[in-house]
Amino acid sequence: MTKKKAYKPGSATIAQNKRARHEYFIEEEFEAGLALQGWEVKSLRAGKANLSDSYVTFMNGEAYLFGATITPLNVASSHVVCDPIRTRKLLLNKRELESLFGRVSREGYTVVALSMYWKNAWSKVKIGVAKGKKDHDKRDDIKEREWKLDKARIMKNANR
């Protein structure tokens, strides 16, 4: 018989980029690993990450996460220089890199970070291939969300 995995309290999600889903149509999602330094892992365990303005850039055939902020802890070692907004290398397969690079360069898409989470002991980033929304698309999304809430409220009162 296999042993049950120990329950870990709390959520595996470190940070989410809610603004990305509002600003872009997400076409496809990928999971990527992150090349981190020791102080960054400590900060992520404390939940001190922000993905609000982050996106993926391509340099020398590799993908980098740009604009993600990981705030250093006060108790982190003093001999290490902590740069909270440094670009971090994304760990992707060659096939995934080529697919992302091709879509960004040819079809006018952009790649944004959607969320950061723990998968076992590894920190992962969910990135999405996205196309920008126009203002009227954003307004339509807001109207649809409000109608969903109103509909739920009406149905709740109708069952009484």
Swiss-Prot record:
Subcellular compartments: Cytoplasm
Keywords: Cytoplasm, RNA-binding
Highest taxon of source: Bacteria
GO BP, sorted A to Z: trans-translation
Pfam families, per the entry: SmpB
One GO MF term attached to the UniProt entry: RNA binding
Main subcellular location of this protein, as a coarse class: cytoplasm
Cellular-component GO terms for this entry: cytosol
Physiological role: Required for rescue of stalled ribosomes mediated by trans-translation. Binds to transfer-messenger RNA (tmRNA), required for stable association of tmRNA with ribosomes. tmRNA and SmpB together mimic tRNA shape, replacing the anticodon stem-loop with SmpB. tmRNA is encoded by the ssrA gene; the 2 termini fold to resemble tRNA(Ala) and it encodes a 'tag peptide', a short internal open reading frame. During trans-translation Ala-aminoacylated tmRNA acts like a tRNA, entering the A-site of stalled ribosomes, displacing the stalled mRNA.
Family under the similarity heading: Belongs to the SmpB family.
PANTHER family named among the record's database cross-references: SSRA-BINDING PROTEIN (PTHR30308:SF2), TMRNA-BINDING COMPONENT OF TRANS-TRANSLATION TAGGING COMPLEX (PTHR30308)
Matching HAMAP family: SmpB (MF_00023)
Protein name per its UniProtKB record: SsrA-binding protein
Record organism: Pectobacterium carotovorum subsp. carotovorum (strain PC1)
Designated gene of the protein: smpB
